[in-house]
UniProtKB/Swiss-Prot annotation:
Active site: Y177, K181
This protein's UniProt keywords: NADP, Oxidoreductase, Virulence
Family in the record: Belongs to the short-chain dehydrogenases/reductases (SDR) family.
This protein's name: Norsolorinic acid ketoreductase stcE
Reaction catalysis annotation: (1'S)-averantin + NADP(+) = norsolorinic acid + NADPH + H(+)
Any Pfam family the entry gives: adh_short
UniProt induction comment: The genes forming the sterigmatocystin biosynthesis cluster are co-regulated and induced on oatmeal porridge or the fungal isolates were grown either on oatmeal porridge or in YEC medium (0.2% yeast extract, 5.0% corn steep liquor). Expression is positively regulated by the cluster-specific transcription factor aflR that binds the palindromic sequence 5'-TCG(N5)CGA-3'found in the promoter.
Residues binding NADP(+): L29, D76, N105, Y177, K181, I208, S210
Enzyme Commission code(s) on record: 1.1.1.349
GO biological process: sterigmatocystin biosynthetic process
The protein's role, per its UniProt record: Short chain dehydrogenase; part of the gene cluster that mediates the biosynthesis of sterigmatocystin (ST), a polyketide-derived furanocoumarin which is part of the most toxic and carcinogenic compounds among the known mycotoxins. The first step in the biosynthesis of sterigmatocystin is the production of hexanoate by the fatty acid synthase (FAS) units stcJ and stcK. The polyketide backbone is assembled by the non-reducing polyketide synthase stcA by condensation of the starter hexanoyl-CoA and 7 malonyl-CoA extender units followed by cyclization and release of norsolorinic acid.
This protein's encoding gene: stcE
Organism of provenance: Emericella nidulans (strain FGSC A4 / ATCC 38163 / CBS 112.46 / NRRL 194 / M139) (Aspergillus nidulans)
GO MF, any single term: oxidoreductase activity
């Protein structure tokens, strides 16, 4: 497995900066979020990558706000050890003392088919990447989140995981994806109740124009996904700004207006 840090550039102390961590940061929504956070002043943006060695270079040219910096770390959601290893490296090599925002964004949607013929190994892969990885990420980052003034733990969800409105999408051949996203919703809501100091919630980013979004559009017979990455990022950032423990934490919200997405 590639090392989580090939070289150690000088990174300013995190003590007076806003520190963000985003998984699945090499493309799509993850890259869009990294780009938006990096444009903010006095920020440290940590990009979690499935393969740091081959993917980190593509982020080097992203523009930066005043006194802001980027750190790329190895954070493969298919790995059970990467989250803890990445946090150790962030503390030891980069002097990270807190995390203000952690976004579990990395996901997989593949091996389409109904529950009646779904091989268990396909479900296990989806559960690891879409659900277990979010839990491992929280467990690894919890102490650094607790050191922040107003920490947020955000999981990118999917409305197809709904139970109450399953009838509207029951024929979609996305059993693996939907079930694993449902598990992630439970985990984040559980984290909300167990940690009174933390704002933890799930956000539906919309049907975005990413590689995964394009696949879903084809499955549903649509020409393309309706929501641009820029629109989704802007909405998520707006929801982050207004989020608090009493009104946001523990909920599954829509990126555009913060309304509830059915469980």
């Amino acid at each position: 497995m590639p090392s989580a840090a090939v070289s150690v550039p000088e990174v300013p102390s995190s003590d007076r900066k806003t520190v963000y961590l985003v998984t699945g940061a090499s493309r799509g929504l993850g890259r869009g979020l990294v780009q938006a956070f990096l444009l903010r002043p006095n920020s440290i943006v940590i990009a979690g990558l499935r393969n740091r060695t081959s993917q980190a270079g593509a982020l080097d040219a992203l523009p930066r706000g005043e006194n802001s910096s980027l750190i790329a770390v190895q954070l493969d959601s298919g790995s059970k050890s990467d989250p803890a290893d990445a946090v150790s490296i962030l503390q030891r090599d980069y002097g990270i003392t807190h995390l203000d925002v952690v976004i579990a964004n990395a996901a997989i949607a593949a091996n389409y088919g109904p529950a009646s013929t779904m091989p268990l190994e396909y479900l296990e892969t989806h559960m690891q990447i879409n659900a277990y990885a979010a839990l491992l990420l929280f467990q690894a980052t919890r102490v650094l989140l607790q050191a922040a003034k107003s920490p947020q733990f955000i999981c990118v969800g999917a409305p197809i995981s709904t139970i109450t409105e399953m009838e509207s999408c029951a024929r979609a051949p996305l059993t693996n994806y939907a079930l694993s996203k449902l598990a992630a919703c439970y985990l984040v809501r559980k984290i909300h109740f167990e940690n009174k100091w933390l704002v933890a919630y799930i956000v539906d980013p919309g049907h975005i124009q990413s590689d995964m979004g394009a696949q879903a559009a084809r499955l549903f017979g649509r020409k393309e996904a309706p929501t641009t990455i820029e629109e989704s990022v802007a909405g998520i950032c707006a929801r982050m700004t207004e989020a608090d423990k009493n009104t946001t934490s523990g909920r599954f919200i829509l990126f555009s207006d913060g309304s509830d997405v059915p469980w």
